[in-house]
Amino acid sequence: LKRTYQALSSLIEETKMEIIHLDSIATSLDIATSESDLSQIKEELMEYGYIKKHYDRRKGQKAQSKSKPFHYVTEDGYDIYVGKNNFQNDELTFKFATGNDWWFHAKKMAGSHVVVKSKDGELPDHIFEIAGQLAAYYSKGRTAPKVEIDYIQKKQVKKPAGAKPGFVVYYTNYSLMA
């Protein structure tokens, strides 16, 4: 009975992580704007075994172009980037953003990673508001009147070993309502 309990506890935890991952994919589908966005989502679904891989017999065909994160430039010149799917979120957070850039995400729900390129480590208050609004809009809570947004400098955001795309951990964060 004890071993059964341990095995079931482990399976329940794995299933919870799968649900979180699939929830983030569903949110990515909600905000996809192009065929290349959908292709990246399909690629992730195939990579993790949710759908079967279909091999293209037509050789020598051009690879589909990768979709890119949304890019916004504020009136005062701050660059804000928004990942549209889990692969983009990983790339944006761990390959593109630098340590002093600011990272935003909807608290405890699936959504896009939002990165504000920092000019000197600090941002004006209105940039925090804009980035928070983008993180709220590109999240599962996009239709809610208010969404709690966590934000922190990118150097405080970590990816656990073996974690699925888009999954991160962070601790000493700030929060705002957007």
Residue locations for each model-derived region?
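Coiled-coil termination/hinge junctions
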Residues: 13-79
